[in-house]
Amino acid sequence: MPFSSEQFTTKLNTLEDSQESISSASKWLLLQYRDAPKVAEMWKEYMLRPSVNTRRKLLGLYLMNHVVQQAKGQKIIQFQDSFGKVAAEVLGRINQEFPRDLKKKLSRVVNILKERNIFSKQVVNDIERSLKTESSPVEALVLPQKLKDFAKDYEKLVKMHHNVCAMKMRFDKSSDELDPSSSVYEENFKTISKIGNMAKDIINESILKRESGIHKLQSTLDDEKRHLDEEQNMLSEIEFVLSAKDPSRLNKNVDEDNIIPTYEVGDGDDDDDDGDNDDDDDDDDDDKNYDDRSNDSNYGVTNISTTDKKNEVVEKTDSEHKNSTHNPSDNQFGMKRTHDMIGHDDANDIPEKKVHLDSKTSEDGTFNSEDGHYELDIEGHVGAQTDEGVENSGGVSSSIQDLLSKLAN
């Protein structure tokens, strides 16, 4: 029967800590003596797997010990040579992984191999040398108590897991062999039920331990997260203090303070003052506009008053003109008075004023003086007049001059 690596791995995974189980697997391997080198290499590869637990590796060690001893008794030297080439490396590695109680069992196996001269002296010396190497640095680490508790539970979980797998395989095999047509079907079913109940108990116990281990790991993880946050806060505080106390940064801040201009404290907000100034300017403009309107209104009133006065002058002139036609003797007096008034007005620097009445000759009532020229057009003022009215035009001129003098004053 040819050697099968899958079948060999299955036998290693199903080994139990009993003489019967180990002897059965050993007999099968002895039949594969032609493939002894392959068996030794597969055994080495299995024993060095990280996924294989220490208990399963211890059972593999027991199997190797049984095979080489039986091979020596049967003078099958192939297994001694093949396992002798890999024994030192494998035993040295698993010794670092084993806990203290398993290390004692490993040492007892090595002593048996040495006493019975299963391997050559060179192989035995190599094995002893590998066992004297320093233990794994993991054992020297200081672990939290929660992790230590989890490690203890984990060892139990590993053992229970293999028991669970073995019980499940046993239950599956028994259920496959159950034949309903058999006369002993009920008895076989009772046996299978017992195996199933045993498997259920082992699985439930394993589940409880795993839940407890997960809780411990989660608690440890929460503690580590809290410590991580605290350390990050400390790091931020240190960086802030170093940045604030940096001499180059302090000098830079001093220079910036010197550059920044200083301002005197005011009574109020500048914006409010500007608004007040704007309001004052608006008030001034309103006052100015009001004054202008007042002046305009006064000017209008003055013009109205002047117009009224002119109308009064015209009415008075007409009246006096009518009177002057009846009192021709007043013409000379009026002419003389007018002349005197004109001289008086010149002395007071009264502006020159001309009233054009479009008279033609001095005979028609035109009066000429050195400083002023007044012309009276009787015909334009009162219409067509008689000759008598023309002769008395001097009186009208005198009255007009008198009124003009009053207006000038």
Curated annotation (Swiss-Prot):
One of its GO terms (molecular function) is DNA binding. Residues 1-135 form the CID domain. Its main location: nucleus. CDD domains: CID_Rtt103. It is found in: Nucleus. Gene3D superfamilies: 1.25.40.90. InterPro entries: CID_dom, ENTH_VHS, Rtt103-like_CID. GO terms for cellular component: chromatin; nucleus; site of double-strand break. Residues 266-289 have a biased composition (Acidic residues). It holds the Pfam family CID. Keywords: DNA-binding, Nucleus, Transcription, Transcription regulation. Residues 250-409 are annotated as: Disordered. It comes from the Eukaryota. Residues 307-323, 337-363, 370-380 have a biased composition (Basic and acidic residues). Present with 3930 molecules/cell in log phase SD medium. Involved in transcription termination by RNA polymerase II and in regulation of Ty1 transposition. Interacts with PCF11, RAI1, RAT1, RPO21 and RBP2. Belongs to the UPF0400 (RTT103) family. This is Regulator of Ty1 transposition protein 103. The lineage of its organism: Eukaryota, Fungi, Dikarya, Ascomycota, Saccharomycotina.
